[in-house]
């Protein structure tokens, strides 16, 4: 589990990234600018813990709507995806909404892009292009980076499922209160304009959309 940590050579790059206008898909029970405090997530880089052992709330976002949708609505799409089904009713049951973030200034994010990983002796296929079996190792890496880089406000990488989009995971305790807001109230991912993007992704993936 610690092999990724042991492989790190030198300090990671801290990228200055403006996330103003970025997108997140999240359960409707959370506000658009709320950090997720759940200890039950089973994601590549979360949950993480603070020094006192409590769960660190985090926020995921992407710079493209397609990236945000692929990492949520399509997260369980099989590979190969051609011929698979996506049920509209299943999306509706999850009560997912889309929010657009507003943030006034750049954030300092640990660069886990291909170049950022290469800088420290890691590769994309060790950290990003991995399945859930490897999540304990990638979470341990994220925990290590969070603890060793107190100036970092989150992580930055290229989406595994939509590699034209950048993704971030932000640390709640390093973002000033009310520093991040939303441009408008959240809207359902089944609102016509957003659902059109879902159907376009379905077409790209060769899937069938069952309404």
PLM features: what roles do these ranges have?
Residues 47-80:
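Extended catalytic/binding region for NAD+/ADP-ribose chemistry, centered on the ART fold
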Residues 1-47, 78-211:
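Active-site and NAD+-binding cores of ADP-ribose-processing enzymes
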